Swiss-Prot record:
Sequence intervals crossing the membrane: 1-21, 37-57, 61-81, 109-129, 176-196
Homology family: Belongs to the CobS family.
Protein name listed in UniProt: Adenosylcobinamide-GDP ribazoletransferase
InterPro entries: CobS
Pfam families found in the cross-reference section: CobS (PF02654)
Pathway, per record: Cofactor biosynthesis; adenosylcobalamin biosynthesis; adenosylcobalamin from cob(II)yrinate a,c-diamide: step 7/7
One GO cellular component, as annotated: plasma membrane
EC code: 2.7.8.26
Top-level division of the source organism's lineage: Bacteria
UniProt-annotated location(s): Cell inner membrane
């Protein structure tokens, strides 16, 4: 169990692990059960950084640094997926054209605009959190990592290569159930009803995104997983801002 957590951590973050372990290909799909716990680990890092930054910096600067820290510690992997999907949306053509543009290592103008807007929205949504900030910092990366599991399980591969193809088909209902349990229980313990409501909103969005990618591309890719993860981070923060003070 612990080994699978470290497999997930090694894939989702660039946090150094001070020991080596064997990772088999089938471990990648099985490790998705622990994706939300990796999100919680990232949240703990953000909460700790927030405590230290608040000692010396005004909140606007501290929150901007938190967004930067999250991007750095994840290697900007999911932001890259968001940019690629934005470029794919801007490309005129069918499925093959969309996939070809996403695979291109260069980032186009629409991808840059998408990145800037996403980072600004994430920063503004985080800055708008007025209550339960540490609880929010713990929870929103967790919800986004659960969305990766939800999007992946039961999906088809839009193409056979890429990082996403290693996970698609390797995880099943057990991984979704375990990941959902971790996410829902943590959301309830940290935030109560707003946490459950936020998880439900993000889960619904992920279902819609999953259907859209299957209709557009015939399946999902690693870029699609990263894009949906980034959008769910923003959606989670915005939802908590919208409903947090009502309960």
């Amino acid at each position: 169990m612990l080994r699978l957590y470290f497999v997930a951590l090694q894939f989702l973050a660039i946090i150094p692990i001070p020991f080596s372990f064997r990772c088999r290909e089938e471990d990648l799909g099985r490790s998705m059960s622990f994706f939300p716990l990796v999100g919680l680990t990232l949240g703990l890092l953000l909460a700790g950084c927030d405590y230290l930054l608040a000692l010396a910096l005004p909140r606007p600067v501290a929150d901007l640094l938190l967004v930067a820290i999250l991007a750095l510690v994840t290697g900007a992997l999911h932001l890259d997926g968001l940019a690629d999907v934005c470029d794919g949306l801007a490309a005129r053509g069918g499925r093959e054209r969309f996939l070809a543009v996403m695979k291109d290592s260069r980032v186009g103008a629409v991808g840059v605009v998408g990145l800037v807007l996403a980072l600004l929205l994430k920063y503004q949504a985080l800055f708008a959190v007025t209550t339960d900030k540490w609880e929010t910092l713990l929870f929103f990366p967790m919800v986004a990592r659960f969305s990766q599991v939800q999007l992946t399980v039961g999906s088809k591969r839009a193409r056979q290569d890429g990082l996403g193809s290693l996970f698609i088909g390797g995880a099943g209902s057990m991984q979704v159930a375990v990941a959902a349990f971790f996410t829902v229980v943590t959301g309830w313990l940290l935030l109560g009803l707003p946490g459950i409501g936020c998880a439900a909103v993000c889960s619904l969005f992920t279902c819609l995104a999953k259907a859209w990618f299957h209709r557009k591309l015939g399946g999902i890719t690693g870029d699609a997983i990263g894009c949906v993860s980034e959008l769910n981070e923003i959606l989670c923060l915005m939802t908590l801002v919208a409903i947090g003070g009502r309960f």
